């Protein structure tokens, strides 16, 4: 039994064991993502404390995610022109400066809502370039064979931090204020930057280089044309767009579900958020262990995620809703990590940044539209209607993609090599 557990753990963390550069990156991300989630909680709390307005918190979310809506497509073109390793060093350094700035403002006691909005918008703008660059760097660190494993581990780090970061942030806010959370986040970037600077660029996976497009417009046109004509990538982008738009609006739905539908308080809201995060973490680790991405598995993941939301719609039991959110988290990372892997594996080296940019537009750039739509549906028919519409939309697109996947030539890598327990 012990040997089997060791073999399973070795396979799950294969990219960490096998690639020194990725091991440094992974360690830094574990620390930095916790700081990032602490900052998100602290920003929302600070704005709410200053304004006493939920609408003001909504504006904060708009500032954070609008850059993805506006600039994700162009960012992908820019990423293809840059060195991913140097770009990530620059974007992480800029985020550390921004976190330090809001920390100083908050600790000095002079923070105003517009300060938080500006920092959040600038942080979002930097992350538009940082996110596809980190994906590009992940490919360079591990290569195509271990890419599904590494992407799943990245997702696991993000969702693990999603559990612990807000909890730790809440404790620090209560004990010392939001400014300390910002300072801790700023300090967390030291771990990332140290890992990046310790990497050996000569060990990066080689990629094909081609002449740059004459203009950003030409480069974007090339990426969109390739995505439109490559059926596997087109299917993944269509699925991502629909599921992200309809099913990923928990920031709007969960507070309303807890307060108005279940007539509960912040404790229930925290519980529901946490169980989804736990499920997402487990799903990421399972995906990392499997280390193989397929269109069919991706469609099953999105269908399971959508089905959980559909089943939540009529429920009034906190226990059952928590169970479905946990399962939804497992299916969520099964879908998201597989879809990202498939797009990158199918992408030519010279177009990978552009296709990742298009993916991030479909995944994160639709948050503004989805949030507005969920708010409208909730006002019209409560969370019951919002969850029902999300479930039906996600299931319908998942079924279409699954049926198409039976005729699509897959671009899949063989599973990562089998490990023998040490």
Language-model-derived ranges and their functions:
Residues 1-422:
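Alpha-helical transmembrane-bundle signature of multi-pass membrane transport and export proteins
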